[in-house]
Amino acid sequence: MPYDVSRRGFLAGLGAGGATMALAPHAAAGGAETAPGSSPAVVQAVHPWVEMKPAATPIRVMVAARLSPAELDTIRQAATGIELIVPKEAAERAAAAASAEVILGEPDVETIRAAKDVKWVQHWAAGLERLPRELMEHPCVLTNMQRVFAPVIAESALGLLLSLTRGLAADAIPNFAKRRWTAASVPLDDLYQKTLGCVGMGGIGTEVSRRAHYGFGMKVLAVDPKPMPRPEWVAELHEPAWLMEMVPQVDVLLSAAPHTRETVKLFGEGVFRAMKKTAYFINVSRGGLVDQDALARALKEGWIRGAGLDVTTPEPLPPEHALWDCPNLVITPHNSGNAPVRQVRIVRLVAENLRRYASGLPLLNVVDKVKGY
């Protein structure tokens, strides 16, 4: 009789280890152990969690998202033994969740409460700050889309920056609308051999910094709380405590950190006053990281040269907000992650993670519910 690794064995250690670990129960007994004091994203599970069982048990997967028939087929074909449950009406969701082992999409509170036996939720969101408390407190493993949108967000971040440095927002675009050929009213700037400071080296920080270095010849400095190898294009990578030492050195300061208790209003008066008067601030992470009153003062009083925001607090930004009156500020409506291939990338990640789950392999984008990212 064919056997495979138990999915419940895959998740058996999470109760003791927390949802920060994606376990790989296919590892042989006596597998590698982590170094004392370390907290890796992937931990190889050892013998007690490796269970042999018949391979015929289906994986009941509830879909809590709008997907086309072709997209559902892609997910269904990701692994053998997948039973997709696609509720057509809201009233059917609770019953579907009650029998599901996996939920894909954006389950509402009622669905989460009914999902007593769910072991894993693959959420469509990149950030966690707006997810239901019931989901964050649920014992299930949670994965998200944290790196799916990063490449296109990086392009948007650099687009915001170029619109400032090359006078596109201040002059070129308004003058074009008026059919005017007029010299720039603001000093034009370049990025070559300038310094980028990245706050956060997750997907967004990685993609922006790589493009800035190799595409524009910028030097990259960065801070991030996670221990990680320094990418070859990054000159210096330090812990967050180095932030205020980094800020005065940079010509562009990028906010690419997640929204957590530690990062609320991280970018305030102290940071903006420490920046060069010729420096730019770019935020493509979350609006809550910025003290917007301090940013408005920084722009109006000339503490910094300009800023580009794809995110604000609240959203949409009210017409009477002080930011609308700021010079050399560009705001886009939180659309930096949008692109025609967005849905393709989402489905591709979901299918890959489902394949991994069915095979007892480590999942991608496992969230640490305690840290908030």
Task: Describe each PLM feature range.
Residues 204:
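Hydrophobic/small residue at the entry helix of a nucleotide-binding pocket
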Residues 14, 107, 125, 257, ...:
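Glycine-rich, N-terminal phosphate-binding loop of Rossmann-like dinucleotide-binding domains
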Residues 1-18:
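N-terminal secretory signal peptides and thylakoid transit peptides that target proteins
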Residues 140-195, 199, 207-211, 215, ...:
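Phosphate-binding beta-alpha-beta segment of Rossmann-like dinucleotide-binding domains, i.e.
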Residues 25-35:
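Signal peptide processing junction and immediate N-terminal pro/mature segment
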Residues 278, 284-373:
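Rossmann-like dinucleotide-binding domain for NAD(H)/NADP(H)
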Residues 225-322:
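Rossmann-like adenosine-cofactor binding region
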Residues 7, 34-141, 268:
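An N-terminal-biased, well-structured beta-alpha scaffold segment characteristic
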